[in-house]
Amino acid sequence: MTQPVTGTSATAAPLDLRAAIAAILDPEVPVVTIEDLGILREVLVDEQARTVNVLITPTYSGCPAMDAIRAHIEHVARRHGYAATVQTRLSPAWTTDWLSAAGRDKLREFGIAPPGQRSEAVPRPVGLSLMARRVTCPLCGSVDTQEISRFGSTACKALRRCNSCREPFDEFKAI
């Protein structure tokens, strides 16, 4: 479930500011916005004080993209005539379930396999199976893929290869 971008205001300028902040691209995966990723948690605009408070949650603790995202939020706010305060909240921890459907589509169209849904926690014993995960190739649609390396071009991606079209591709890891 994507976490909503919230805030209240009746005028267009803050809505434009919210939209501009939500449209900031992730520097490590520049086809998805911070809203698509679900890391943009809240945008609160104070028109009188000309300030905006933005709450973000990193995809993982120590994510190097967060400094660039914070700087970009501050730049966008200044461009709109606002001072920005950007806060990072680690709890609840970000999950790939917060990726929007549009974000998943953008990843796939860019050649990155989007993550599957996480398993839900249940208060009882669960059975385990030793079956390989089925990851669909974003290039040809085959599920005959294999993991080449658990560590891809960024910490949030793994490197895979399609056994049908033989092309390598990134997989966005499910967290």
Task: Give, region by region, the residue ranges found by the protein language model.
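Domain-level signature for proteins that mediate thiol-based redox and metal-cofactor handling
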Residues: 1-175
